[in-house]
């Protein structure tokens, strides 16, 4: 290798390493296949061991059979019987197997006869041709010299023959020998003629060359085998070849050694390998045939001679000796080594069983033992492998393989045997042909015919599907066999190479590499030594120079890298700064453009509003006098109207003056369009009724400056007196109508917006003779209120209530007059009142009418610009629109824009612009995120003033009482806390989103884009705060009654009521319920067994209790009986008699005696008749009431609080017993249960019976039978097994209800009347149960109440002071109704929208209210309700900013829960100490 290669580190060994790695991968693959082969051999060996065990068992069975005599001698007959059965079964199975073998043999014979490829005539023609060629060849043998033998043809022929010999291994020898002569008649000469021909061929063989004779024989044999495909003939040929395998010829091996053609070596080796396998199979077949064949027809065809038997034995010995050397080869598809699942070869014709001869069994076991041994593959088929050429660069290796000659040894013997047999046969056939056909001419004719037929046959045989024929004439089967043998040999060579020579080649390559590397090292060391010679002189200088050079190169590289990086960063920075600067300039430019756009729109709107407001003087009407602006505003009357397209204006180039002029032109144009619209509406009517124009006052649209000077008095037809501020509102509304402008009357709730709007309608009818048509749209809850108010204040108006069913509305539409734009006093109607629902339903009809004035009460119903209400009402044809609302802003500024766009679509046409002007700043300020821009707020008020009028109560109404708002904070109870925590844990990941949703409140309630699941979750949390029973109510518990109830109790009761006295049916009712189980006792058992024992036990017990242990027995207690006799005047032994009487009768008699004694005492004092009557009266009424006060308190406060601790699951009366056929038992049971004295004493006497006894029969009351002695239960809870839920527990389980219970007690005590608002109707149901329990008088109004019922409920509340509580739904009962009879408002749960609650509380705090109104709001601390309340305060602040122009502190008192012993009262709520920092604000 050159020095430059070493210095450049060129490694030529790299390619070698890659090649070796590929060889190693191939070796790993082969090793895995070898392991698989070893596993398969182990598996086979295990099977052979199992076979040995079975054979041993068979041997033991034979011994057992041989010992049968001993068993008989020992008289063990039972075991012999069992063995005989076993032998019979074995014999039966053996017979079945023999039948199956005979069936197989018959089937194989039929198949062999059916397989004949060519007809007999064709075979005869071909045989004639071959005989003539053989005769010509034999004649030339004597003249020809030594020629080469074409070994591959003979080998191929032999391979075909050997394969043919293997094809019939299951037929018997006698059958194969008998089938030799079956194909043709030429073989009938017998076996002796064949021996003679063999001797003749041997003599001729001495004078000819062995190689040429073999060649001729091979060619002839190839043709003969092709002609004779009979199975029996191939079997004989295979036996002959196998018998001569030991006599191999060395000359043939020498000829094979001299051949240099590698292909011939490979072919011969492949054929030899196949022949080895065929010889081994052939030897096994011969061995099995010798063991199992039976001679048949010995005279005609003997099986074999002695010499052939000896040769067969030698063949077997040779096969056994060479078994370890020869390795079986198959094709890859049938390779046993690599295909363990391959099928085993079919067994021989006869099977060795346990009944076979001992030598056969031994021989079979030896075969099995030999088969069990793993074949040794250490011997290979070639002598050596040498590497002739190895090129690492081309990845190529050349190997020279030297084959062993042991294969040729067998081949030579096979060739000799085949040659001898064929020569003998050909001579015989040639001789016969010569004798039969002597004429030469005829032979030539036949030859020509045969030649033509042969040419046709050759053409047929040439097509072998592209397989190699090696120049021979062979069949497709032989060609396939040759190709397979070639492939097997080639594959086996590579297998042996992979198994044996890979490691050796690998070691050789490694040795070459190590040698080469060593040479490289030596060379490099020599080069280094030579190089050091001239470096040693200045080594240090060179070393320093190299170090400095490396350092300089490194520093230079770092410098340039740093320089490039800095330049790149500077360039990026400059580009970024330029981009940011351009972006900033563009943003500034765009912001200026947007500012100019907004300023243009604002200026346009301000000019319009300022002009209208100056004429209408809204500020003066509101009571807020504002100084005149110094700003020079354009006069819209002198400014020429012009429509300037907003998008066509160049805001970049126009200056402020030009933009302001264009804004004034647009404002003037909007004013002109508004006037033109109103004028067109009036002109249409003027053209229609020109005759009435003189009587009407004309609207002055040409001189609008005089509109502000108009002062309107109260209409005379208005049947009420307007207050001063209401009269100002009337002037403002009339000016708006004259100007043709729509407006919003936004006075605070309770200031009379309804009466002001009615007064405008009266003003139009009285001064302008405009009687309609007027349209009033209100919520459903205020429809009757509007009808009552209009009919009350303006009786001249004809009202058309437009609601009801579809048919009713269809009838009402007949009163419409669509021809006249203005109605007169004689028109069918003047004012039509309907609801928002009816407007949406009948929008198509209402849009066809032209309305003079449309009033929308509670205009927050159209706060959403996306709703169908807003869109339908906007499309109505109206001269003027008036919106009545106490809360123009409820949630955000978008709702205000919806109202402004509804009244002035030309000015407020874009919500995005309005949002850009005001919404962002005001809403963010309300949330506390930014400061408020006062300039923006001033401009907003300037825009809103002309269109909206709003007065608050404290400015216009001094006589109205105060309003106090109090937030009552409660803590969750134990059950509520658990429920809240469970819900919170289930939604832990989304709890923050739920709280935010609760804060967004009305946006969700209004049907926003929030997730419905979050809304449901918020409602669940609110339910927990209200009451836990909203989820699940406590059940009523009662035991299962296993009872049969009486079905005629009603009839019995009626009979009692109609009877004149006591009847026996009274007692029957007590036992009307019986047990379904009836037990019947046999009479004999009852009388002979049960009754005597019972009587004896009763007698013994009575004797012990009444005699032996009794204190009233004179024998036991003589002294006490004497004293008692002296005191009572009874005889000495009377006490024992009394003591033995019935216990219940003694109790009844005792009560009679005590009653008589008290009566006697009273008779002594005064007149008997008077005193008895008085005592009875007083004893029944006054005296128990006075003397039983302590008992009542004891029962009410203590005993009623006691509840059963256990409720049985099942109750049942006693089982019914009766004795079959025993009247005595029935009578005793009836007398015991239905004793009239006892039953009458325990039960009560019915009132009709008492009346008959006292009045008709004149029985004194003191002589009435004793009754009602059955003891009363402890309290109401023990009177029945039915357990009702405790109302006390129902109250204490809710924190809100518990505080409400305390509050209502104080409110009831101080004669307050209460409105309670709810959000959930189900909570209202629970509240009704509570009020019923506390016996509070109440009424209820919710969304399910009908319109007629709502009117009656409101009337009852206003007129009946006995009603303490009015339960209302916030949405249904918070709009448009007057409930001034109440002075206390309680919000059990708050609404999403704070304005809804404000409207609800103003139902009481409004005109007509003379008392102070107190508002309580129940809230639960630490829950979603707190977040909702905080958000509501933010919304209220937005309203205050927009409406009043400033923010004010909302001081609402917040009270906390108190200890249990301290009650919550209104007085305590209003007198909280200042130390708590909770302020209370009085709102007017």
From Swiss-Prot:
<dbReference type="InterPro" id="IPR014001">
    <property type="entry name" value="Helicase_ATP-bd"/>
</dbReference>
<keyword id="KW-0234">DNA repair</keyword>
<protein>
    <recommendedName>
        <fullName>Chromatin-remodeling ATPase INO80</fullName>
        <ecNumber>3.6.4.-</ecNumber>
    </recommendedName>
</protein>
<keyword id="KW-0539">Nucleus</keyword>
<dbReference type="InterPro" id="IPR049730">
    <property type="entry name" value="SNF2/RAD54-like_C"/>
</dbReference>
<feature type="compositionally biased region" description="Basic and acidic residues">
    <location>
        <begin position="674"/>
        <end position="686"/>
    </location>
</feature>
<feature type="binding site">
    <location>
        <begin position="747"/>
        <end position="754"/>
    </location>
    <ligand>
        <name>ATP</name>
    </ligand>
</feature>
<dbReference type="GO" id="GO:0006366">
    <property type="term" value="P:transcription by RNA polymerase II"/>
</dbReference>
<dbReference type="GO" id="GO:0045944">
    <property type="term" value="P:positive regulation of transcription by RNA polymerase II"/>
</dbReference>
<feature type="region of interest" description="Disordered">
    <location>
        <begin position="237"/>
        <end position="353"/>
    </location>
</feature>
<feature type="domain" description="Helicase ATP-binding">
    <location>
        <begin position="734"/>
        <end position="906"/>
    </location>
</feature>
<dbReference type="GO" id="GO:0000722">
    <property type="term" value="P:telomere maintenance via recombination"/>
</dbReference>
<feature type="short sequence motif" description="DEAQ box">
    <location>
        <begin position="857"/>
        <end position="860"/>
    </location>
</feature>
<comment type="similarity">
    <text>Belongs to the SNF2/RAD54 helicase family.</text>
</comment>
<dbReference type="GO" id="GO:0042393">
    <property type="term" value="F:histone binding"/>
</dbReference>
<comment type="function">
    <text>ATPase component of the INO80 complex which remodels chromatin by shifting nucleosomes and is involved in DNA repair.</text>
</comment>
<feature type="region of interest" description="Disordered">
    <location>
        <begin position="673"/>
        <end position="702"/>
    </location>
</feature>
<keyword id="KW-0227">DNA damage</keyword>
<dbReference type="GO" id="GO:0032006">
    <property type="term" value="P:regulation of TOR signaling"/>
</dbReference>
<keyword id="KW-0010">Activator</keyword>
<feature type="region of interest" description="Disordered">
    <location>
        <begin position="1446"/>
        <end position="1484"/>
    </location>
</feature>
<dbReference type="InterPro" id="IPR000330">
    <property type="entry name" value="SNF2_N"/>
</dbReference>
<dbReference type="InterPro" id="IPR050520">
    <property type="entry name" value="INO80/SWR1_helicase"/>
</dbReference>
<feature type="compositionally biased region" description="Polar residues">
    <location>
        <begin position="1465"/>
        <end position="1484"/>
    </location>
</feature>
<feature type="region of interest" description="Disordered">
    <location>
        <begin position="149"/>
        <end position="193"/>
    </location>
</feature>
<feature type="coiled-coil region">
    <location>
        <begin position="404"/>
        <end position="462"/>
    </location>
</feature>
<feature type="compositionally biased region" description="Acidic residues">
    <location>
        <begin position="454"/>
        <end position="465"/>
    </location>
</feature>
<dbReference type="GO" id="GO:0031011">
    <property type="term" value="C:Ino80 complex"/>
</dbReference>
<feature type="compositionally biased region" description="Basic and acidic residues">
    <location>
        <begin position="426"/>
        <end position="439"/>
    </location>
</feature>
<dbReference type="InterPro" id="IPR031047">
    <property type="entry name" value="DEXQc_INO80"/>
</dbReference>
<keyword id="KW-0378">Hydrolase</keyword>
<dbReference type="InterPro" id="IPR027417">
    <property type="entry name" value="P-loop_NTPase"/>
</dbReference>
<keyword id="KW-0175">Coiled coil</keyword>
<dbReference type="GO" id="GO:0000775">
    <property type="term" value="C:chromosome, centromeric region"/>
</dbReference>
<dbReference type="GO" id="GO:0140658">
    <property type="term" value="F:ATP-dependent chromatin remodeler activity"/>
</dbReference>
<dbReference type="InterPro" id="IPR020838">
    <property type="entry name" value="DBINO"/>
</dbReference>
<dbReference type="GO" id="GO:0016887">
    <property type="term" value="F:ATP hydrolysis activity"/>
</dbReference>
<feature type="compositionally biased region" description="Polar residues">
    <location>
        <begin position="261"/>
        <end position="285"/>
    </location>
</feature>
<feature type="domain" description="DBINO">
    <location>
        <begin position="493"/>
        <end position="618"/>
    </location>
</feature>
<keyword id="KW-0238">DNA-binding</keyword>
<keyword id="KW-0804">Transcription</keyword>
<feature type="compositionally biased region" description="Polar residues">
    <location>
        <begin position="241"/>
        <end position="250"/>
    </location>
</feature>
